[in-house]
Amino acid sequence: MKYKHIVFDIDGTLIDTEYAVINSLIKTITEITGRTPQYESLKFALGITGRNALELLKIPDIEDALKRWDRNMKLLQHTIQPFQGIKECLQSLLSRSYILGIVTSKTYQEYYSDFEPLGLADYFSTIVCADDTDEHKPQAAPLVAYLAKAHVSPENALYIGDSIYDIQCANNAGVDSGLVLWSNNVSNPIRADYYFKTPNDISKIL
């Protein structure tokens, strides 16, 4: 097989966090500024680090805002679930001797609070979170860190995500990319090496 490692983004790829992320951010901004932004205006925050999103929003006290956002996110934890078919997809890939990994813009704190309780963490051998690199998606650094940590060459890895940031990160790292189409974060055509309409397509195509 061409690839040894199949590396996944988390939000919008493995689990559906859009509602929780955007609504908790709306609540956070409202608490801080007194204004309530529109849902659609905050979709840019999906796929980048929380810190980067708040910086782009020109929130003055980032540390306070991150704490508020985390607290508001926990209130919506019950809305976060794996996408249908994800668990079966991961099981199928493991049964065919692929090594699974994660590269995410989440911090480790967010990873442990948002992702680990959903019962998917044990499928993955190597994890790279935002804490591991100074630069983040769409820069190459997160995937380069994964390749080093997992001792794998770029041509032996495939990175699967849902956003332009994921595909650009893969391109910048010299890694093939797969774009998932089951979440709603893609408004314009994005050029990727593979396109997956459902999680089952990953097992079919690879």
What are the residue ranges of the model-derived segments?
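Conserved phosphate-coupling serine/threonine residues in phosphotransfer and NTP-handling enzymes
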Residues: 13, 104-106
